[in-house]
C-alpha cells in the first residue's frame, strides 16, 4: 500500500499524490491556470443563469396556462349570460304582450282611456 509507515523510524517511505489510472499508469496532477478557473466560473455562472432562465420560463408558461384557463372560463360565463339575457328578453316580450291583452280586455282600463281622450 502506498503511504506505508516504516516501522524503524516511523516515517513514510512512499507517498504518492497522484492516482493510478485504469491502465496502471500513474496520473499526473496538474494545476489549473487562473484563466481556466475564470472560464470554469463563467461556465458555472452561465449554468446558473440558464437554470434561472429555465425556471422563469417555466413559471411564465404556467402563468400563461392559468390565464388561458381563466379566459376560457370567463368566455363560457359570458356565453351563458348572453343566452340567459336572450331568454329573459323573450319572456319579457311575452309578459308585455300578456299585460297589453289584459289591459285591452279590461273595462277598467278602457274607461280610463276614454276619459283621458276626452280631456
Curated annotation (Swiss-Prot):
Coiled-coil annotated residue ranges, if any: 48-95
GO biological process: positive regulation of macroautophagy; regulation of protein complex stability
Keyword terms of this UniProt record: Coiled coil, Cytoplasm, Golgi apparatus, Membrane
Database matches in Gene3D superfamilies: 1.20.5.170
Start and end residues of each stretch annotated as Disordered: 1-26
Highest rank taxon of the organism: Eukaryota
Entry GO CC: cytosol; Golgi membrane
InterPro entries referenced in this protein's UniProt entry, alphabetically: SCOC
Compartments where located: Golgi apparatus membrane; Golgi apparatus, trans-Golgi network; Cytoplasm, Cytosol
Major subcellular site: Golgi
Compositionally biased residues, Acidic residues: 1-10
Membrane topology: Peripheral membrane protein
Pfam families recorded: DUF2205
PANTHER family associated with the record: SHORT COILED COIL PROTEIN (PTHR21614), SHORT COILED-COIL PROTEIN A (PTHR21614:SF4)
Family that this chain belongs to: Belongs to the SCOC family.
Record's function text: Positive regulator of amino acid starvation-induced autophagy.
Name of the featured protein: Short coiled-coil protein A
Gene symbol of the encoding locus: scoca
Amino acid at each position: 500500500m502506498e503511504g506505508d509507515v516504516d516501522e524503524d523510524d516511523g516515517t513514510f517511505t512512499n507517498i504518492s499524490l497522484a492516482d493510478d489510472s485504469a491502465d496502471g499508469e500513474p496520473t499526473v496532477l496538474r494545476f489549473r491556470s487562473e484563466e481556466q478557473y475564470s472560464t470554469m466560473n463563467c461556465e458555472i455562472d452561465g449554468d446558473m443563469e440558464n437554470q434561472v432562465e429555465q425556471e422563469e420560463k417555466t413559471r411564465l408558461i404556467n402563468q400563461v396556462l392559468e390565464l388561458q384557463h381563466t379566459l376560457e372560463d370567463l368566455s363560457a360565463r359570458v356565453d351563458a349570460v348572453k343566452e340567459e339575457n336572450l331568454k329573459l328578453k323573450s319572456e319579457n316580450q311575452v309578459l308585455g304582450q300578456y299585460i297589453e291583452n289584459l289591459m285591452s280586455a279590461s273595462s277598467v282600463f278602457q274607461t280610463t282611456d276614454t276619459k283621458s281622450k276626452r280631456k
